[in-house]
């Protein structure tokens, strides 16, 4: 089979000169199998030394032309004239025959020109080069793909502006579209690309493609010469066409100074120093206005302010000074309620000044009229009555406070102890003349206070009325004035309303009378245990020693069961050891002191009086009272 094909090919090659046209030769060559071409290298359609297509272009999408080389003519072997054949494919297969180039002259040497009659834009074309009946090059394309417009024409430039430094300038470059391109009707839409460079440079600077025929060029150096060129292409298809002619741009010198290098403004340094300066200014402002800014951000807390008080005292915490200032101002003093259960002081009725000048204090004390108008030595009982007699601790506390308040002096303490014992005897004497002789004087005078350890101790105030009655009977009897002990000094006033007196003169007759009636002293034991909760030493000495002469056990026993009674342990032991203590050595008479001065004014009606200093009598001080229970008292007493 291969042999017959080889023979047929040789026959055709030998008879190629007999064919009338080159088209048949080309057709035969194209139909020749590849195997024959490999056997005969001269039949190859594309050789390194054979003609080739260089380009095919359509400047306006209406006509096109193709160009090729003729290198084969310069070779050792001459293949004959070069011919171009073309065909148009209407379908998938090439059904039409090849046709030769219609014009070899219009487009120039080694070219083929297709006018508008042979041009179809949307129909593909295939072209080939043949020499001596053989195909040397072949190519297929469409007219729209080979569009390359002609270069723009009429390039020029104008100066836009020059920089302030005179170093740079801006220009505007203008041109016109190719004359054969139908731009007005929109048959072609062209894109333009501008390139420029200095004359001595080799690399062109390209600008972005534009659709207009003018573009500004910025920052061109003065005293430099530039080259500018422009080219165009079909938008969205095709390739750029040829560049236009080069436009030379020379900018004149605008200033006397020439600058060979660019002057770059130090924007970075300016920004850095600007930020640093603003930061410094901000810190200075904050430092100078820090107090005001602090008040705006953190408002101050209002300080405590009280009218008349320095706020610094409140800040420093000096509460004592604040309390002192508050105590001075009347508006800040606390209000005492009228229903207070505690009595703060005892109100006294103060006589008029003219009344004091009429008679002495001694006469007023001895006057019965004065007793009627001013019972209990002018003391007005302001006790509310709510203080219980069973609260010795509270009364003792108030008594101690009065002693500390300079109520009595150390000189008056022995006189007070002696006077209290004498007062007991005085009451016993008065009891003989009273219809109530079976009651003990000690139970009728609870307002007279026995001093213990240089401190007055309060007694229950239930028998205050009987005490006042006894005192009134004694003072109203003129015959008994020579036998009484005169109490001239009010040493203290207890919160419960009792008055503590100091003796001025001891009467011998009174003391002897007290000793001459031991049976009356023994009778006081019964009422003492029933009415009083406390026994002091002076009472125990007078009542307990005479207990064996009178039988009062039946009277004492019921009262012991009713309540707890406490008496002084030392007084019991002393009285038991000395049964004959009822006989006392009478002392010398002492002058009667008058009210000499007012010691303290506690209120408009409360007074503490001082007496003249008197010589101290020779007597034994009563020892401090201890307390024993009722059972111990029953065991000790005979």
From Swiss-Prot:
Gene3D superfamilies: Immunoglobulins. Changing residue 242 to D: Found in a patient with idiopathic short stature; uncertain significance. Residues 353-391 are annotated as: Disordered. Changing residue 162 to I: Found in a patient with idiopathic short stature; uncertain significance. GO terms for cellular component: cell surface; cytoplasmic ribonucleoprotein granule; cytosol; external side of plasma membrane; extracellular region; extracellular space; growth hormone receptor complex; membrane. Residues 362-384 have a biased composition (Basic and acidic residues). One of its GO terms (biological process) is positive regulation of cell differentiation. Residues 151-254 form the Fibronectin type-III domain. The modification Phosphoserine is found at residue 341. The modification Phosphotyrosine is found at residues 487, 595. A motif (UbE motif) lies at residues 340-349. Changing residue 173 to G: In LARS; almost completely abolishes GH-binding at cell surface: 26% binding to membrane fractions. The WSXWS motif appears to be necessary for proper protein folding and thereby efficient intracellular transport and cell-surface receptor binding. The box 1 motif is required for JAK interaction and/or activation. It is linked to Laron syndrome: A severe form of growth hormone insensitivity characterized by growth impairment, short stature, dysfunctional growth hormone receptor, and failure to generate insulin-like growth factor I in response to growth hormone. Growth hormone insensitivity, partial: A disease characterized by partial resistance to growth hormone resulting in short stature. Short stature is defined by a standing height more than 2 standard deviations below the mean (or below the 2.5 percentile) for sex and chronological age, compared with a well-nourished, healthy, genetically relevant population. On growth hormone (GH) binding, forms homodimers and binds JAK2 via a box 1-containing domain. PANTHER family: CYTOKINE RECEPTOR, INTERLEUKIN 5 RECEPTOR SUBUNIT ALPHA. This is Growth hormone receptor.
């Amino acid at each position: 089979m291969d042999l017959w094909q080889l023979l047929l090919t040789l026959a055709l090659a030998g008879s190629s000169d007999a064919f009338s046209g080159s088209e048949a030769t080309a057709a035969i060559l194209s139909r020749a199998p590849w195997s024959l071409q490999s056997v005969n290298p001269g039949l190859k359609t594309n050789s390194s030394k054979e003609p080739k297509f260089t380009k095919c272009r359509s400047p306006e999408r209406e006509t096109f032309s193709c160009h090729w080389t003729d290198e084969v003519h310069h070779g050792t072997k001459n293949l004959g004239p070069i011919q171009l054949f073309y065909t148009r494919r209407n379908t998938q297969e090439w059904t039409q025959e090849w046709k030769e180039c219609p014009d070899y002259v219009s487009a120039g040497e080694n070219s083929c020109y297709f006018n508008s009659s042979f041009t179809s834009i949307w129909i593909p074309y295939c072209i080939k080069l043949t020499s001596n009946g053989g195909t040397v090059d072949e190519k297929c394309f469409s007219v729209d793909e080979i569009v390359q417009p002609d270069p723009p024409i009429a390039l020029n430039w104008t100066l836009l502006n020059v920089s302030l430094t005179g170093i740079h300038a801006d220009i505007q470059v203008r041109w016109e579209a190719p004359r054969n391109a139908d731009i007005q009707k929109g048959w072609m839409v062209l894109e333009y690309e501008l390139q420029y460079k200095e004359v001595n440079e080799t690399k062109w600077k390209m600008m972005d493609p534009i659709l207009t025929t003018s573009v500004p060029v910025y920052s061109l150096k003065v005293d430099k010469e530039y080259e500018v060129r422009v080219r165009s292409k079909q938008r969205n298809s095709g390739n750029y066409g040829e560049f236009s002619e080069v436009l030379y741009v020379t900018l004149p010198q605008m200033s006397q100074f020439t600058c060979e290098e660019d002057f770059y403004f130090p924007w970075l340094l300016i920004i850095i120093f600007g930020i640093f300066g603003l930061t410094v200014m901000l810190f200075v402002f904050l430092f100078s206005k820090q107090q005001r800014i602090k008040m705006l951000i953190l408002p101050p807390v209002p300080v405590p302010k009280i009218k008349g008080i320095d706020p610094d005292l409140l800040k420093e915490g000096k509460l004592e000074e604040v309390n002192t200032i508050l105590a001075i101002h009347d508006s800040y003093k606390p209000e005492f309620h009228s229903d207070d259960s505690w009595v703060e002081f005892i109100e006294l009725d103060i006589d008029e000044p003219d009344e004091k000048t009429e008679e002495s204090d001694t006469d007023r004390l001895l006057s019965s009229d004065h007793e009627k108008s001013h019972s209990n030595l002018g003391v007005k009982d302001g006790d509310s009555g709510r203080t219980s007699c069973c609260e010795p601790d509270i009364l003792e506390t108030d008594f101690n406070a009065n002693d500390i308040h300079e109520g009595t002096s150390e000189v008056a303490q022995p006189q007070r102890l002696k006077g209290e014992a004498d007062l007991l005897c005085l009451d016993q004497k008065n009891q003989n003349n009273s219809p109530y002789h079976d009651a003990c004087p000690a139970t009728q005078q609870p307002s007279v206070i026995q001093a213990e350890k240089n401190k007055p101790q309060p007694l229950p105030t239930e028998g205050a009325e009987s005490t006042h009655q006894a005192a009134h009977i004694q003072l109203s009897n003129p015959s008994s004035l020579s036998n009484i002990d005169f109490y001239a000094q009010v040493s203290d006033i207890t919160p419960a309303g009792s008055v503590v007196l100091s003796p001025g003169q001891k009467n011998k007759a009174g003391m002897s009378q007290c000793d001459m009636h031991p049976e009356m002293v023994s009778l006081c034991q019964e009422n003492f245990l029933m009415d009083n909760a406390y026994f002091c030493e002076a009472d125990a000495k007078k009542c307990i020693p005479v207990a064996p002469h009178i039988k009062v056990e039946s009277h004492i026993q019921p009262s012991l069961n009713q309540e707890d009674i406490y008496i002084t342990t030392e007084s019991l032991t002393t009285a038991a050891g000395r049964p004959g203590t009822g006989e006392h050595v009478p002392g010398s008479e002492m002058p009667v002191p008058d009210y000499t001065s007012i010691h303290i004014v506690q209120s408009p009606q409360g007074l503490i009086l001082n007496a003249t200093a008197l010589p101290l009598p020779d007597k034994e001080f009563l020892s401090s009272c201890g307390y024993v229970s009722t059972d111990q008292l029953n065991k000790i007493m005979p």
